[in-house]
């Protein structure tokens, strides 16, 4: 059975659940899940956990995500992207400089409180926000704390004098739960000009990047290639201190027992027969199980 992570380069128009469904059919494996939902119109990195790797999904969510996209000053929509209803239009007489846009972006770096878009999957009283929006019901959107590690221009913005609009390409590295289109909208508010996101692509997530990604169609056409394309579970723990277990300690770990280790690391990856079998965490002077991966072969 396959155990590991396949990094999919998701096409526009598909949901993350669609990708999981198609992979289950192509590989004839039920134990498959995705780490980090991508909206249908967003393309790029979607890590898919298979077999024992599904145990990593919660950990995968904790790692930063990186996006590249395009924003536009000139109008704003209710969904914060170009698929929404236009709420405000305002021609730019003079374009923003690189310095002005970057200065605005810098104000969002660090830990911030963010209000999710009304057209989002966030739930209020057991109901998705987009369901309230479709029914025309106003509801208070809950603020959430997210962290923005990077929000930068990728190149010089482009000004269309005839339309009075200015487009800009950006790169964002952020924590889970961040709505990038909200950051584009909020940048517009910061600079007192309506703004909308016109394009978004995720280029890294959960420690994997777009260079490791494959198209879903490639796997569907050649399911047997999945074993060549899959990232081993051990690759996810490349930043952990790894300790090879002698037979005696492996027998203890296999039974979930605490063990002593000659290290000061808070968490360690324990390996046996060249495979990570468990993640142990320091509890006082003893290391105890945090995540068991005994079937990682």
Curated annotation (Swiss-Prot):
Known role: Responsible for synthesis of pseudouridine from uracil-55 in the psi GC loop of transfer RNAs.
EC number(s) recorded for this UniProt protein: 5.4.99.25
PANTHER family, A to Z: PSEUDOURIDYLATE SYNTHASE TRUB1 (PTHR13767:SF2), TRNA-PSEUDOURIDINE SYNTHASE (PTHR13767)
GO annotation (BP), single: mRNA pseudouridine synthesis
InterPro entries recorded: PsdUridine_synth_cat_dom_sf, PsdUridine_synth_N, tRNA_psdUridine_synth_TruB, TruB_C
Keyword tRNA processing on entry: yes
Protein name in the entry: tRNA pseudouridine synthase B
Keywords, ordered alphabetically: Isomerase, tRNA processing
Lineage: Bacteria, Bacillati, Bacillota, Bacilli, Lactobacillales
Entries under SUPFAM superfamilies matching the protein: Pseudouridine synthase (SSF55120)
Family indicated by similarity: Belongs to the pseudouridine synthase TruB family. Type 1 subfamily.
HAMAP family, per database record: TruB_bact
